[in-house]
Amino acid sequence: MTTLTSTPRQDGYYMPAEWAPHSQTWMVWPQRPDNWRDNAAPAQAAFAAVAKAIARFEPVTVCASAEQYLAARAALDDPRIRVVEMSSDDAWVRDTGPTFVIDDNGGLRGVDWTFNAWGGKDGGLYADWQRDDEVARKILEIEYCDRYRTEGFVLEGGSIHVDGEGTLITTEECLLNRNRNPQLSREQIEAVLREHLAVDSIIWLPHGLFNDETDGHVDNFCCFVRPGEVLLAWTDDANDPNYARCQAAMAVLQRARDAKGRALIVHKIPIPGPLHASDAECAGVVALDGSQLRDPSIRLAGSYVNFLIVNGGIIAPAFGDPLDGEAERILREVFPEHDVVMVPGREILLGGGNIHCITQQQPAPFVR
């Protein structure tokens, strides 16, 4: 692995859309007791179910600590799931792993963003996060991929979505938050995104979902489903704190034009719940200094948008909610050529995210 001093755009590389063919998906095995209840056993079962669902469509590599390696290997009993030993601080590989970029000549490289646990000393969710900031480099070394390191520029993979044709969508709530890159203006942040993802048009939604502890990651709220079309989490309940957020996002999306000059088609998918952790679920989390508080009174940021597109499939969360069926129907309508697989997502949600947050796709290189 070589750490390059150029940028992907200078070298002809770009971030492809999630629906482009994958060579595999990456995950990290959960274990920290101050985030995952009951010593992470329920979360590990949930992660294993997600990995096995993905493995129906493409290979999966799961990174597990030395302490957890044998347990992970036993739980992930599928020939298409590889387990590698890797230290980390937590299991959110969407945010700690590399953003892979490709060119039109069979090349594959990775962008290694600086990671600060969603806010560092100003609202970050745990300390220390040094091992998580090294996950992207370790994955790139395993894959013999050259690396672009954005030293000092903080970004998580869950805060961006691209259409593969030059358009990126994100939220002001996250990328303009003072706990990410306070030294940079919006224009300077856009310049980094344009250079490292080779995008030309950036759509800024004001907010993500209410109470999203990542400061409003877009991957829990709105995503591209194909060029010119997005899927937006939605509520018609004016008393829901997400109502104003949905309305504001819709106003932006209706005015927006993508990099090809297209107006966007916006599909809506309902927001489940309101969902809350139970007293018992919160009691199973070990309270440690510097970690995120788990409280039954705090609404969970549940979302059906937090799914992963894989080769021929959609791996989406179900919550045991009355809206699960409607969400599955909408996903089947929006992705008619994909097999929609709903996987229990509550345990992942209790830790602060969902299926898209715990996965990172590795695109398959190709020659145009």
Curated annotation (Swiss-Prot):
Family matches, as Gene3D superfamilies: L-arginine/glycine Amidinotransferase, Chain A (3.75.10.10)
This protein's record includes keyword Hydrolase: yes
Any Pfam family matching the protein: PAD_porph
Catalytic activity: agmatine + H2O = N-carbamoylputrescine + NH4(+)
Entry-linked InterPro entries: Agmatine_deiminase, Peptidyl-Arg-deiminase_porph
E.C. numbers: 3.5.3.12
Keyword Flavoprotein: no
GO MF term list: agmatine deiminase activity; protein-arginine deiminase activity
Active site location: 357
Keyword annotations: Hydrolase, Polyamine biosynthesis
Pathway note: Amine and polyamine biosynthesis; putrescine biosynthesis via agmatine pathway; N-carbamoylputrescine from agmatine: step 1/1
Gene Ontology biological process terms in this record: putrescine biosynthetic process from arginine
EC main group: hydrolase
Function comment: Mediates the hydrolysis of agmatine into N-carbamoylputrescine in the arginine decarboxylase (ADC) pathway of putrescine biosynthesis, a basic polyamine.
Family according to the record: Belongs to the agmatine deiminase family.
HAMAP family: Agmatine_deimin
Subunit relationships: Homodimer.
Record-linked PANTHER family: AGMATINE DEIMINASE-RELATED (PTHR31377:SF0)
Protein name: Agmatine deiminase
